[in-house]
Structures are given as structure tokens and as C-alpha cells.
Amino acid sequence: MIAIRQGRETGVDGIQALHEIGCTATLRQAQPLEDGRYDVVTVGTQRFRLAALDDSKAYLQGEVDLLTEETGDEAAAAQAARVVRDGFRAYLSALGERGVTQVSAPELPGDPVTLSYLVAASMIIDLGDRQALLAEPDALHRLTAERTLLSRELTMLRTLTATPAPDLRNSPYSSN
């Protein structure tokens, strides 16, 4: 899976319309809807860098280079994980106070790599922020970026009493 930079189609822009980093995905659930579409749940499994596109077939296909998963400096990553774990619990609590989520803070993983992906997947952030996290070279850099994002989001939740809004640009039009 790889995100399109803008809109729903790559159009004539090809590789320029796509983000450079994506991830392989495992299908967890596919539920048919009455209108013929499917509600699909996937889990990202391994990051990759898009190397080339092949548009000679009916569906656009890409050639990718799989990326290794690094922790970064072990001691610094462990410290960053402690800070992010606390910040993420505070974030979930603040969302709960605003009625956005009723999920209590789960038992968070101790492994910095796993924690970094759990936090990235769970935060209510826009595609640009989510893509930036995916593109970080290792868990330490991802956790450092998450610490900044958690601080920003907590400040907005506490100061502005604002709740994150979903990205409506890619949603079907509704007059409601």
C-alpha cells in the first residue's frame, strides 16, 4: 500500500503522484456492504521504498525495495519510548475527556519499534504527519517525531478544547 499525495487517482503524474514510502499489508477482514463495496481492515507489515512504476498492465504496479527495521541508538530509543508511552497515555486520556474515544490506555509494548508503530497507527493525525512518521529511518527518529506530535496534539486538546477532525478531502460528498 502506498499513499497518493493528493486526490484519489495518480493520473498522468505516475510516480510523482505517490509518496516514496509505503508498506506491505496483511488483510485482516473484508466485509461486503449492501452497495457492492467492501469494508476492508488491513495491518501494515513491512515498509518499502517505491523504486519504479509499471503502467503496462490494467492496474498500476510498482517495483519496491523492502526496508529493514532499525531501532537506532538502543539507549536513546528506550528513553524516547518511555517519554512517548507517557505522552500517548495522556493523549488517550485527553481524547476520552472530549468524548472522541472511550478506549482506556492499553498495556503498551516495551519494544521501541513496536511502540513507535502502535502510536503512529493510533493517533488522529493527517496523512502528511502519518506519512512523515512512516518515512522516518528508525524507531528512535519515529519516537522523537511522535513526541513532538503528541505535544502538539495535547496542547490543542487542552488549550483549544478542540478535537481532531477527520480528513474529509477523500470522503464522499454529503450535504449533511
Q: Could you tell me what each predicted segment is?
A:
Residues 1-176:
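N-terminal low-complexity, acidic/polar interaction/targeting segments
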